[in-house]
Amino acid sequence: MLPAAALPWTLFFLGAAASLQVDIVPSQGEISVGESKFFLCQVAGEAKYKDISWFSPNGEKLTPNQQRISVVRNDDFSSTLTIYNANIDDAGIYKCVVSSVEEGDSEATVNVKIFQKLMFKNAPTPQEFKEGDDAVIVCDVVSSLPPTIIWKHKGRDVMLKKDVRFIVLSNNYLQIRGIKKTDEGTYRCEGRILARGEINFKDIQVIVNVPPSVRARQSTMNATANLSQSVTLACDADGFPEPTMTWTKDGEPIEQEDNEEKYSFNYDGSELIIKKVDKSDEAEYICIAENKAGEQDATIHLKVFAKPKITYVENKTAMELEDQITLTCEASGDPIPSITWKTSTRNISNEEKTLDGRIVVRSHARVSSLTLKEIQYTDAGEYVCTASNTIGQDSQAMYLEVQYAPKLQGPVAVYTWEGNQVNITCEVFAYPSAVISWFRDGQLLPSSNYSNIKIYNTPSASYLEVTPDSENDFGNYNCTAVNRIGQESSEFILVQADTPSSPSIDRVEPYSSTARVEFDEPEATGGVPILKYKAEWRALGEGEWHSRLYDAKEANVEGTITISGLKPETTYSVRLSAVNGKGVGEISLPSDFKTQPVREPSAPKLEGQMGEDGNSIKVNVIKQDDGGSPIRHYLIKYKAKHSSEWKPEIRLPSGIDHVMLKSLDWNAEYEVYVIAENQQGKSKPAHYAFRTSAQPTVIPASTSPTSGLGTAAIVGILIVIFVLLLVAVDVTCYFLNKCGLLMCIAVNLCGKSGPGAKGKDMEEGKAAFSKDESKEPIVEVRTEEERTPNHDGGKHTEPNETTPLTEPEHTADTAATVEDMLPSVTTGTTNSDTITETFATAQNSPTSETTTLTSSIAPPATAIPDSNAMSPGQATPAKAGASPVSPPPPSSTPKVAPLVDLSDTPSSAPATNNLSSSVLSNQGAVLSPSTVANMAETSKAAAGNKSAAPTPANLTSPPAPSEPKQEVSSTKSPEKEAAQPSTVKSPTETAKNPSNPKSEAASGGTTNPSQNEDFKMDEGTFKTPDIDLAKDVFAALGTTTPASVASGQARELASSTADSSVPAAPAKTEKTPVEDKSEVQATEIRHLQQK
């Protein structure tokens, strides 16, 4: 017990100690092996502490800054203990002690438990096993508490399969007895600790290796040596992993690297290719397949055969009638070849003997001999030795020469006649070659006494050419041949030929218009061939014989001839004679027959010729007897034999002798029936059958009528087409747009004005003619009926290629465009309203000025006929698509319009011809200057007083007849306008070819004259310039073309008729004042002059 005095102090310190509070957060901890964790020691209170210390489970104080177990003083009131990468030995009670000067020591503890998580210590993947072995899948699991192990395969517990082959061993390994390839896959080793609810698993790949199995595709292979061929030895192997293949020959490994020229392998080594097989390659070859599970091999025996080859032959020479000679032939090959002999005329088998025993053949092993006894000259020639076995054969020729004396052959008797050249042939057989001579009566030929004889020699014959002049040339001729073995002579007789005897007529088969004569050949030909047969016939009672010659070759084939051109129901006599080179022979006895009455024709004769394509045929129809009536046609029917339907019947005119049947079925039999028909009826059908060719897989090039073009030819053609296209485009640009290469050449080399020079030409007064063209002008007058937007009050439209240029200041419904294209003045009257237009001067003359021509139209006072005037019936028909329009009534008020003369060049020839009113309204008319002046004067008067009556003309044209009114479209396409070029005619031509004014008025549209077009003038022919003058003038003025004729005005004109006349011509010196121009016209001219 404590003393009483110490008790108060003890209570004091206990009270102080009790006042200190030390806590460790967390208060307890569990750490798995390998993990890290920290603990915080905290002190509650405001006193200052001297120290905060940590002690390990074994009582040792933990020092700061250790590597694995670290202690760190955070501040005056806390400290941290950190355990890194914990292990089992770190488990225990850790103590935190707090020391204070004022209050003493206080402490707190924490129990640190360290456990081992589930770990797979030994569970390799993959694990491989051999098929059929007992496999044990290893899986070692490490844990603080004993785990429960479960094996799964394909997501299921293997023990639930109830397969006795699967067993979990005591060490938790999985055993599979007699493992199969189907057992291969992924197995999961899964460990569980129930106390902690911990689970972990490891997937193990199980591979089952299968030992290789190998088999040879052919256990025995045959090959042929010395053919530069290759042989392939092949083995097929299975197994897992894929086995590797190696080869041996008679136990020795084959390496491709050692002899690449002899051996090669495919990509997996399963095929061995032996190149250029020879006899040394015959051996036993083994293919070996090997993998992880084992190896296996297969054997292939290669047997090499040799094609026969002739190794020895020898040419021989013998004398005729010599005792014997032997020909020898040796050959090699495997199997041993058999040897046969043959000549050019026969085959000689082994052990064969001729009937007379002259030829003997003996064979032994690889040698054969041919023995000839009592040699004859016919034994000479080529002997072929052939060695053959199951692999092939080989042949070699040897030659036997037999020397013998000459032997002569040839026809002994030769026929000819005086003057006919003939050859006497002396064929000579001799070895060595013989010298041939001809003799006549012991005299060597040729000689001076026989100038009509020539000799021609060849190596095998001699020909004596004789042209008999008289009886003396006929007789015996001797041929003699000599060589070093001997000589031979032969006599030949030249006999004078005679005409043939008569043929005999056996039977005559008459028809309506023909007769078929059967005959026998003459008994004697006269020594020379019969060339023709002459048939003669006449009707009973006629004195003259009709005759015809028939070729002997054709007549002798069937022994018949056919006489044609006979009359029905008429009795005839016929006789025959043969013709040879000597002449016509004896005539046979006549044979009488009577032709049949008119009837249906005989069936024609058919011949076929297959086409090159194989499925077409040309059937020739050969006419036979027509039955006394001309054949009208042939009826042709055909079909394939396997088909029940006939093709459509073909009617062939009698003048055509064949028909082509095309697009027939391939490899099919066809039958054709042809019937001839005349007025009396139809003949019996003629039948012809044929078969088409089999359908070719590839059509041969020869069937094509033309050979294919090569690549170079095709490229060349394309280049030519491209160049031609460029030329065409350039020419088009030249004529239409005045541009392109041709235009550049014309401008730079020929001095032609370019497109940019048009305005300049206008300013210089060059208008519409080039340097070398005529100075005679042409004025083209055209009637326009299309109303432009400007005249209709619509929006102004810019001119383009498809819209005409218009003149906005005129309000007239009908106007005519006047273009002065050359300095000559041309104009005329029209039954339309007043024609008006303003042009600038187009002359280079320094005195040229702007002139206004005014034309007015009024009814004539009197109609004065003119001899040159055209009647209405002579009017040219209206253009296609144009509607006739009636001229205006005579009471119409004349309208005045100024015309501009583009030339001040005078002309002395006044107009003499009266022009039809359609000329001016339809096309340009040629007028004299007097007429133009008269029109100008009238225009002037009209400008002063518009109501003044016009001056009547001296000459009038008869009124145009009225024509029915037709609706006309006021819109034209550029194509239609281009298709209707205006034409300028001379007065003479206009009088000859007047145009219909109403149809022209209805046609409407502005038509430009064709460029470079030839025009007939009174003084000759000239070409218009290749530029559009109207377009250039209005381009310079900055205005559009005159207004077109409105459709309404055209209909108004169509409802009335009127006469038109040419105003009286003023004096030649009379001028038209320019001051009478309207204000708008004056403004346009000033504008043009300023430019």
Swiss-Prot record:
GO annotation (BP), single: synaptic membrane adhesion
Query: Which residues are exposed on the Cytoplasmic face of the membrane?
Result: 730-1091
Domain Fibronectin type-III: start-end pairs:
499-598, 600-696
Q: Which UniProt keywords apply?
A: Cell adhesion, Cell membrane, Disulfide bond, Glycoprotein, Immunoglobulin domain, Membrane, Repeat, Signal, Transmembrane, Transmembrane helix
Q: Where in the cell is it found?
A: Cell membrane
Would the keyword Disulfide bond be found if you checked this record's keyword annotation?
yes
Which residues does UniProt assign to the signal peptide?
1-19
List, as start-end ranges, the regions of compositional bias called Low complexity: 845-856
UniProt main location, coarse: membrane
Question: Disulphide bridges in this chain?
Answer: 41-96, 139-189, 235-287, 329-385, 426-479
Q: Which residues form the Ig-like C2-type domain?
A: 20-113, 116-205, 212-301, 308-403, 406-495
Transmembrane regions = 712-729
Q: Where does heparin bind?
A: 152-156, 161-165
Q: Where is this region: Disordered?
A: 756-809, 840-916, 937-1023, 1041-1091
The record lists glycosylation at 222, 315, 347, 423, 449, 478
How this chain sits in the membrane, per its record, is: Single-pass membrane protein
The record's annotation in InterPro entries points to: FN3_dom, FN3_sf, Ig-like_dom, Ig-like_dom_sf, Ig-like_fold, Ig_I-set, Ig_sub, Ig_sub2
Sequence ranges of Polar residues compositional bias: 904-916, 980-1012
Function recorded in the entry: This protein is a cell adhesion molecule involved in neuron-neuron adhesion, neurite fasciculation, outgrowth of neurites, etc.
Q: What is this protein called?
A: Neural cell adhesion molecule 1
UniProt organism field? Gallus gallus (Chicken)
